[in-house]
């Protein structure tokens, strides 16, 4: 009941003052050094994503055909890193071919590096939702174990997506006869594969908004944030694809570093949209509670 009252109050304010709410979100994002936080998240995501994918593929290859795993990985990495999924998948495939060389020390080191992005993301969320941290802090053991639990959940998600995607691909090879005309299901299969990826994006973003901030966030708030961030990213992704395929000369400027630069740039934009969505949710909570607008700049304690 209390959440509904807060939601009604926030919705009424936003409908009455949409521009003021938008400006307040932008001010809060700037005061919290949102772009700086996004840069940190993107940098550690770049360090984490390759070892994480390698570990996931090696683990799941015991249950699912590795070739099918790599095809699914390449398709849905394209949603995260436009134009660069092939090179990342090639590195993962090369690691998979040499998986017998993996030792416990190497596996543990890769697992440790894979957790960096989630740890930094949790810290960034604590800056955005500073009003929650001031009330309740998360136990350090929970913070330490959270990245690994989240990686396990993502690994299970990759397995489920691979199974469903494989089923849809098989369906795409079939056809139906309707009113004497044969209709191929290839187009339907392609559309469903894209929607599966979009639904996965929304689910992952929603889970981040639910899990990473301290305290319990309303599911409806997290879902709205997840849908908004996913749709904004889809728009940004199409712009990136168009830019890199028509206007960009990044390969001329950076040469062999092109892949890393493009991936970093894509992750930077994605992290910015992710944290901006979190700022929208934080501002929505503030408006719902009827608190005055306060966005003091983020500062650090003196040495």
Q: Where would I find each of the regions flagged by the language model?
A:
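Membrane-embedded alpha-helices and immediately adjacent juxtamembrane helical segments
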Residues: 1-303
């Amino acid at each position: 009941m209390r959440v509904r009252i807060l939601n009604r109050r926030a919705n009424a304010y936003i409908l009455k003052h949409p521009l003021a709410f938008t400006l307040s979100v932008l001010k809060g994002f700037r005061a919290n050094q949102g772009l700086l936080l996004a840069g940190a998240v993107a940098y550690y995501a770049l360090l984490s994503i390759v070892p994480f994918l390698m570990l996931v593929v090696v683990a799941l290859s015991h249950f699912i055909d590795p070739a099918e795993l790599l095809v699914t990985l390449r398709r849905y990495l394209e949603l995260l890193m436009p134009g660069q999924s092939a090179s990342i998948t090639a590195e993962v495939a090369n690691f998979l071919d040499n998986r017998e060389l993996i030792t416990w020390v190497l596996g543990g080191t890769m697992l440790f590096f894979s957790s960096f992005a989630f740890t930094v993301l949790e810290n960034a969320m604590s800056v955005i939702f500073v009003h929650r941290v001031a009330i309740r802090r998360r136990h350090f053991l929970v913070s330490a174990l959270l990245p690994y639990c989240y990686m396990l959940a993502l690994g299970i998600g990759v397995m489920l997506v691979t199974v469903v995607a494989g089923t849809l691909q098989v369906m795409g090879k079939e056809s139906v006869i309707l009113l004497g005309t044969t209709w191929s299901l290839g187009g339907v299969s392609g559309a469903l594969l894209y929607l599966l990826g979009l639904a996965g994006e929304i689910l992952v973003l929603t889970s981040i908004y639910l899990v990473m901030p301290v305290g319990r966030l309303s599911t409806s708030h997290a879902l709205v944030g997840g849908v908004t961030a996913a749709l904004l990213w889809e728009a940004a992704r199409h712009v990136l694809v168009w830019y890199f395929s028509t206007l960009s000369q990044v390969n001329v400027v950076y040469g062999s570093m092109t892949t890393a630069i493009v991936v970093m740039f894509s992750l930077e934009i994605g992290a910015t949209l992710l944290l901006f969505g979190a700022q929208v949710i934080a501002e929505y909570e503030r408006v719902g509670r009827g608190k005055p607008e306060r966005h003091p700049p983020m500062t650090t304690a003196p040495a």
